[in-house]
Amino acid sequence: MAVNSAAIRWLGDHLQLLDQRCLPTETLWLDICDSQQAADAIRNMVVRGAPAIGITAAYGLALEAQIMGNDASWVTLQNAVATLADSRPTAVNLFWALERLQRYAGDLQGKALAQALAEDAEAIHREDLAANQAMGEFGADLLPSGATVYTHCNTGALATGGHGTALGIIRSAWARNQLTGVFAGETRPWLQGSRLTSWELLNDGIPVTLVADSCAGQLMQQGKIQAVIVGADRITANGDTANKIGTYNLAVLAQHHNIPFIVAAPVSTLDPALPNGSHIVIEERDANEVRNVQGKSLAPEHCPVYNPAFDITPAQLITAIVTERGVVHRPDTAKINSHLAQTKES
């Protein structure tokens, strides 16, 4: 069965990913035919955003099982599982998707296993879109009429199964006519804000103004921002949140200026196994991502570089976490546990 979204197309016998490294100047779709290609696409930023990474990994494992045919079993798939799990260590949705597939597949083998994995990967894809649409409505309820919001990185349809997390809230608020506009930080070093978020919002007709990351404090000081809305790659049991590098800076600035700081993420991004943010593994990426921009060197060749892909925002700085199940106000361990318990009951 074909399942399509803005950046991910499942065609039954292969996967197509929109190469987000080429946007906004070029639209290029890449064919993904096995787990190694899926892992490479995740690692090399062809696809990014925690939900989209989880969806891609699920399809990648299903493809590997198809290739194995009658030899497919959870034991023979372990190398593929390890390869996919190693592709981006911070995004918990990746591990969640692989663990879910294992539970769903059970003791199946051969073609029955391959079919089951494909079915559940499709379900993960569809469920993410529905979750984002619900999240958008819950999050829009938190915004005042006429708000202008600030967002960081890209959390839209390109980063998910559709609609988006933080950008989904923005889309839903715009549909309600309660949003005035959006400031999008450029998000160095990969420029997801300038290349992807501005592209998505402009295509939707939502007023967006692109700014340098270092402009956020001035905008808040001038009273031009009524809320900051970001996504998440992992949220620990106490509400500490890993997200794109620069998110922590925004949370500190928002608290200083008494501006709501809202995190949007599906329940699959919550990781109750980790008590707090100090336990999150932070991915460090290649130094040349900072030294160079689109292949052009902007720094001395041998200058040392520190390039973490994510930072940790303490729960104390977060006004609310929005999931598809509702809103966790001023998150802490007890509130996160209660939210997860309600999710299990429903």
Curated annotation (Swiss-Prot):
<feature type="binding site">
    <location>
        <begin position="243"/>
        <end position="244"/>
    </location>
    <ligand>
        <name>substrate</name>
    </ligand>
</feature>
<dbReference type="InterPro" id="IPR000649">
    <property type="entry name" value="IF-2B-related"/>
</dbReference>
<dbReference type="InterPro" id="IPR005251">
    <property type="entry name" value="IF-M1Pi"/>
</dbReference>
<feature type="binding site">
    <location>
        <position position="192"/>
    </location>
    <ligand>
        <name>substrate</name>
    </ligand>
</feature>
<comment type="similarity">
    <text>Belongs to the eIF-2B alpha/beta/delta subunits family. MtnA subfamily.</text>
</comment>
<dbReference type="InterPro" id="IPR027363">
    <property type="entry name" value="M1Pi_N"/>
</dbReference>
<keyword id="KW-0486">Methionine biosynthesis</keyword>
<dbReference type="Pfam" id="PF01008">
    <property type="entry name" value="IF-2B"/>
</dbReference>
<comment type="pathway">
    <text>Amino-acid biosynthesis; L-methionine biosynthesis via salvage pathway; L-methionine from S-methyl-5-thio-alpha-D-ribose 1-phosphate: step 1/6.</text>
</comment>
<feature type="binding site">
    <location>
        <position position="88"/>
    </location>
    <ligand>
        <name>substrate</name>
    </ligand>
</feature>
<comment type="function">
    <text>Catalyzes the interconversion of methylthioribose-1-phosphate (MTR-1-P) into methylthioribulose-1-phosphate (MTRu-1-P).</text>
</comment>
<protein>
    <recommendedName>
        <fullName>Methylthioribose-1-phosphate isomerase</fullName>
        <ecNumber>5.3.1.23</ecNumber>
    </recommendedName>
</protein>
<feature type="active site" description="Proton donor">
    <location>
        <position position="233"/>
    </location>
</feature>
<keyword id="KW-0028">Amino-acid biosynthesis</keyword>
<dbReference type="InterPro" id="IPR042529">
    <property type="entry name" value="IF_2B-like_C"/>
</dbReference>
<keyword id="KW-0413">Isomerase</keyword>
<feature type="site" description="Transition state stabilizer">
    <location>
        <position position="153"/>
    </location>
</feature>
<dbReference type="GO" id="GO:0019509">
    <property type="term" value="P:L-methionine salvage from methylthioadenosine"/>
</dbReference>
<dbReference type="GO" id="GO:0046523">
    <property type="term" value="F:S-methyl-5-thioribose-1-phosphate isomerase activity"/>
</dbReference>
<dbReference type="InterPro" id="IPR011559">
    <property type="entry name" value="Initiation_fac_2B_a/b/d"/>
</dbReference>
<dbReference type="InterPro" id="IPR037171">
    <property type="entry name" value="NagB/RpiA_transferase-like"/>
</dbReference>
<feature type="binding site">
    <location>
        <begin position="48"/>
        <end position="50"/>
    </location>
    <ligand>
        <name>substrate</name>
    </ligand>
</feature>
